[in-house]
Amino acid sequence: MAHPLIDALPGFPVKISAVLPSLDKAWAEEGEDAARASQMNLVLMFGAGVSAADAQARFDEAIRFAQRYPCRLVVLAARPAAEAAAPLEAKVNVVCFLDPARRGKRCCEALMLAHGAPTAELESLVSTWLEGDLPTNVWAHGVTPAEFAPWLGWSARCRRVVADRSLVGDAFFALPFPHPKGVRDLAVARCLPVRQALGQFLAGHAPADLVRGLRSVTVSHGAGLSGEAAGLLAWMKGCLTHCAGLSRSHLDATFALSAQAPSGDNLAAA
């Protein structure tokens, strides 16, 4: 049974044993003017619940990323538990684009694999698809904690594991990652402009004034923004704790999230 995500993504189907030889053939067809210089491996993991349209959008984002940071892209599409024994299914694609900076053509390798239950053999296969002398970053999109748990040991060799808390929830980030400091939350990254704006506002006040008499801080959020809200609340708590330390003040405030977003733009602390 063809995997809907692999079926929807661009590329040509190949046998598992022919993936790397097919990649070499694709490069040969592009000619000598195609630049082949990768900086990293990017493994894009899709959970079984990701739609074909969502996968296509994330694949396009990964290709745009590769245009700035040349990489080998490996796409892993998980099958539902009911299809755990389904055979592996692969695709290969070489996406080329003009690079004005180099005045030539640059290409991105994309290897795609639909798989069932993770096994040691599957991990070994994926490892052979990676460029061994380059760092590996993992982007887990729509991957549940149960789906990623079998990959935890394998992820020890990865420099970064990134996911979106608003999609995967807190439980994903509570997994026992071998290198917790290498795990990043995309929801937190998206809030950088908000943190910068709040930081400028807070910088206009003395640290002691910010924490004096403060009883509570609540970050309210709309649907689908729980990850951003959690990251912002943690950042606020860190800032105010630092302010208390600088001013030698006592901070006795509660920090909470609220799923009932108030209307309009506002910032409230009591």
Task: Show where each model-derived region lies.
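An N-terminal, globular interaction/scaffold subdomain
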Residues: 1-139
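Residues at beta-strand starts and edge strands
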Residues: 38, 213, 265-267
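Residues that cap or initiate secondary-structure elements
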Residues: 48-50, 223-225, 263
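Short connector loops at secondary-structure junctions
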Residues: 75-85, 250-262
